[in-house]
């Protein structure tokens, strides 16, 4: 996958998650936990978070060494939640079977997300063990943006995603945290 995507090993992959996996595996403040709940449950938005995790959780322990190394960084992991019905079902199955599922977008790195199967580069499709033509995916956009990724400890924006402005507004209005100002200050 890394070769086909031309992806750096310095860039960790994301883990499939849902509210229950998040609560069992990610160690963050009560405020950060409430932010995730509000965004994913009250506003029904996709959200990727980065936060410290419990390494001896059965889901985390299910990762083989290579996958563990490439889906965690400095004691943190990226967990994608609420990314549509197919994603949510895979996350549910992962949780019920205590089996982590690690993923990366179906595109060459840094070329933008692909929203229909036909747009995925052949070099990426050709290395997949299974492919699913899901039709036009939720949250498709002209900029090729995937999910927003927010560090739940520093509240720094790691990646601006398709519903970033909505997420910023929700967090600023409900929690008085200005993600854009925090990220700008970190330069």
Q: Positions of the model-derived regions?
A:
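Active-site-adjacent structural elements in enzyme catalytic cores
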Residues: 1-187
């Amino acid at each position: 996958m890394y070769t086909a995507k031309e992806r750096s090993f310095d860039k960790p992959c994301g883990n499939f998650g849902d509210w229950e996996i998040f609560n069992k595996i990610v160690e963050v403040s009560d405020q950060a936990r409430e932010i995730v709940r509000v965004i994913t449950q009250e506003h029904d938005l996709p959200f990727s978070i980065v936060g410290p995790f419990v390494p001896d959780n059965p889901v985390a322990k299910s990762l083989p060494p290579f996958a563990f190394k490439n889906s965690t960084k400095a004691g943190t992991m990226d967990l994608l939640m609420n990314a549509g019905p197919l994603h949510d079902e895979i996350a549910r199955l992962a949780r019920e079977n205590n089996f982590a599922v690690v993923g990366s977008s179906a595109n060459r790195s840094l070329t933008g997300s692909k929203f229909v199967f036909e747009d995925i580069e052949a070099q990426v499709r050709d290395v997949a063990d299974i492919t699913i033509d899901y039709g036009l995916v939720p949250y498709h956009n002209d900029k090729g943006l995937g999910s927003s990724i927010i560090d739940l400890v520093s509240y720094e924006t790691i990646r601006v995603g398709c519903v970033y402005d909505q997420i910023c507004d929700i967090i600023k209005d409900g929690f008085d945290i200005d993600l854009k100002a925090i990220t700008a200050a970190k330069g």
